[in-house]
Design a protein with these regions (language model features):
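Glycine-rich segments within core transmembrane alpha-helices of 12-TM secondary carriers
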Residues: 109, 189-214
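Hydrophobic core of transmembrane alpha-helices in multi-pass small-molecule transporters
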Residues: 46-47, 144-145, 154-171
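Cytoplasmic helix-loop-helix junction between adjacent transmembrane helices
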Residues: 166-198
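Symmetry-related core transmembrane helices of the 12-TM Major Facilitator Superfamily/SLC fold
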Residues: 220-238
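Helix-loop boundary and gating motifs at the non-cytosolic
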Residues: 19-106, 273-278, 282-287
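C-terminal ends and interior cores of transmembrane alpha-helices
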Residues: 135-152
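Cytoplasmic membrane-interface "Motif A"-like loop-to-helix N-cap segments
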Residues: 122-137
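Juxtamembrane intracellular "pre-TM" segments in multi-pass secondary transporters
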Residues: 9-35, 243-278
Length: 287
């Protein structure tokens, strides 16, 4: 029997002899700051994830239903076709517009995330690279969410749904980057574990809040998800230790090729293709 040699993690501080107590951004957090990093990213994963799940699973399908005259807040409500006087076939009536909304959102998100990632890396402010994006993204998400909650047509709904993909990327992408930048290798497993727990709790909480909200009226889920979005970016910044200024970092010109490179699959990587195919099939089955 033989023991396989583990593949080295080329980004690990243990490999290149960097101090594992120092983060990538050069900071050495104190014990209190490590605790704030842990609970800050845990709270952020709940605050950012819960409203997003509530929108995707409950609020937006109900907005589609309301657009086509079906009020899910009224028990036993059946939409009547004014032309024939007969009940509308709800499932077949709503399946296609909901599918269009989902596809539009996926395509927009595919471009939004790498774009925001590149722009965030090049942000130079006294507040740091990630803080302005998280605060601004949360507030912008709240504003767009309130617009989506209005009784608007399917075309306008799709347009603002695209806007929300970019706004949510402004909130979520810098948060993910902050974990890799601000957490030293020594504490990364623990903080990432709590972040994962927060993601699961946020998903469960989002579904529950969406289901409870729609019991009152179809706008209620949009109102409290907007509040959560507005709070999420601000609360995360307040809980986490202050991000160091990026104003002194060298400026980098925006290069669109860096955005496009993130959309290209890695060459000569069959393992990636298999994992990508498996992930796609899994998500298609869940969806």
């Amino acid at each position: 029997a033989s023991v396989d040699t583990p593949a080295p993690d080329m980004s690990s501080a243990y490999l290149d002899m960097r101090d594992p107590m120092v983060a990538v951004n050069g900071q050495r957090p104190t014990a209190g700051q490590v605790s704030r990093l842990n609970w800050g990213f845990f709270a952020a994963s709940i605050l950012v994830g819960a409203p997003w799940v509530a929108l995707n699973t409950i609020a937006m399908p109900n907005a589609i239903a309301r657009t086509f005259g079906y009020d899910t807040a009224v028990a036993g409500h059946i939409a009547i076709n004014p032309a024939t006087g007969r009940p509308l076939p709800v499932a077949t009536e709503l399946a296609m517009p909901l599918a269009v909304l989902v596809i539009v959102g996926v395509v927009a998100s595919m471009f939004a995330m790498p774009l925001i990632s590149v722009l965030s890396d090049r942000t130079r402010t006294p507040l740091g690279r990630r803080t302005p994006w998280m605060v601004g993204g949360g507030l912008l998400c709240a504003l767009i969410t309130l617009i989506l909650g209005q009784n608007i047509g399917i075309i306008v709904l799709c347009i603002f749904w695209v806007f929300l993909q970019f706004a949510y990327a402004m909130l979520s992408v810098p948060l993910t980057s902050a974990i890799s930048e601000r957490v030293p290798d020594k504490f990364r497993p623990r903080i990432e574990r709590w972040h994962g727990i927060g993601v699961m709790l946020g998903q469960a909480l989002g579904v529950c809040m969406g289901a409870l909200g729609v019991m009152f009226n179809s706008f209620t889920p949009f109102s409290y998800t907007a509040v959560l979005f507005a709070v999420s970016g601000i609360a995360t910044v307040l809980i986490l230790p202050k991000e160091p200024s990026s104003a002194e970092q060298p400026n980098q010109l925006f290069d669109r090729s860096q955005v496009l490179d993130q959309l290209r699959p890695p060459a000569h990587a069959p393992e990636f293709s298999r994992v990508f195919a498996a992930r796609t099939c899994m998500m298609a089955g869940v969806g």
